[in-house]
Amino acid sequence: IMFERPSNGRKTASPGWYNTASFEQFANEEGVYAKTINGDAFSKEIKNLTIETIKKDLGKVDLVVYSLAAPRRTTPDGVTYRSVLKTTGEEFTNKNLNLKDNSIGMKSIPAATEEEVEATVKVMGGEDWKLWMQALKDADVLSEDASTVAYSYIGSELTYPIYFEGTIGAAKKHLHQTADEITKEVGVKALISVNKGLVTQASAAIPIVPLYMS
């Protein structure tokens, strides 16, 4: 599942659209199943479409990888929350790599309000992950020994103020808590994979972190 902009005839598609289309093409050429659903993974409509696709093409699945980086999320009750990339406690200043002109300068990150932290947890935390797993479980499209994994990152102390101790860190902590809830309440083994830092479209948007990763 992706949420990417296709070409409209006047503008090219987003990079992610081409990457995913190429992956699907190469997989099919090798005889490996791959199908892309383009839409808002937070929405009930995409969840339902995914369930129907699994039923039609695969029957059941034994692994679900949950990896979403998004600026906003509309919850089932219709409320839209927006995530922020800020520190918590007090303002944080450090060197930053500006990818627009490849220059290095100082960057100050303001401290988030309590409401901004809560909103970021709503978007980037584990609530939607749990909704996904419950929906898949209820639809009987998970194999008996199915498991699910979500990704997290800790990083070095240099990145703590903006990541581990920042708003996105609060969301990742919620993700860890949700893994236990999914395992106990949904009945699906849920794991968190803590990985190294990678330069991606999502990670490049985090202030200060790109300089550390480079």
Model-derived segments and their meaning:
Residues 2-6, 65-71, 150-154:
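Short loop/turn segments at strand-loop or loop-helix junctions that form parts
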Residues 2-33:
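Glycine-rich phosphate-binding loop and adjoining beta1-alpha1-beta2 segment
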Residues 8-12, 86-188, 194-214:
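Catalytic loop of short-chain dehydrogenase/reductase
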Residues 13-15, 51, 78-83:
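"Short basic amphipathic alpha-helical interaction patches in structured regions
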Residues 32, 49-78:
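A glycine-rich helix->loop->beta "capping" turn
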Residues 33-35, 189-191:
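Conserved beta-strand segments of alpha/beta enzyme cores
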Residues 39-41, 66-81, 87-108:
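Conserved NAD(P)H cofactor-binding loop of Rossmann-fold oxidoreductase domains
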Residues 39-50, 126:
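The beta1-alpha1 cofactor-binding region of Rossmann-like NAD(H)/NADP(H)-dependent oxidoreductases
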